[in-house]
């Protein structure tokens, strides 16, 4: 119960900023949802709603395919 007191409420960044569609060309936005290894951060950590998480996943995969984002980190 004490642990619940210190948790911050997560919010959906896309809903708060009024973004309707996640664009694969917006690389700066997509980088915020990818960890240092190149993996997509899950919605339970970022607080993104399911609708936008699906769009985000598709956008990241498209950006990777077009070489806008790396598949993995630089080893």
UniProtKB/Swiss-Prot annotation:
Gene of this entry: rpsR
Protein name: Small ribosomal subunit protein bS18
GO molecular function: small ribosomal subunit rRNA binding; structural constituent of ribosome
Stored Gene3D superfamilies: Ribosomal protein S18
One CC-aspect GO term: cytosolic small ribosomal subunit
Annotated function: Binds as a heterodimer with protein bS6 to the central domain of the 16S rRNA, where it helps stabilize the platform of the 30S subunit.
Cited InterPro entries: Ribosomal_bS18 (IPR001648), Ribosomal_bS18_CS (IPR018275), Ribosomal_bS18_sf (IPR036870)
Keywords for this protein: Ribonucleoprotein, Ribosomal protein, RNA-binding, rRNA-binding
Gene Ontology biological process terms in this record: translation
Subunit description: Part of the 30S ribosomal subunit. Forms a tight heterodimer with protein bS6.
Species assigned in the record: Methylobacillus flagellatus (strain ATCC 51484 / DSM 6875 / VKM B-1610 / KT)
Domain of life (superkingdom): Bacteria
Family membership: Belongs to the bacterial ribosomal protein bS18 family.
């Amino acid at each position: 119960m004490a642990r619940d007191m210190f948790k911050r409420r997560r919010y959906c960044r896309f809903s708060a900023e009024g973004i309707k569609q996640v664009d694969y060309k917006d690389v700066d936005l997509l980088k915020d949802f990818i960890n240092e290894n190149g993996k997509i951060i899950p919605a339970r950590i970022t607080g993104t709603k399911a609708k936008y998480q699906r769009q985000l996943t598709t956008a990241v995969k498209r950006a990777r395919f077009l070489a806008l984002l790396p598949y993995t980190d630089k080893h």
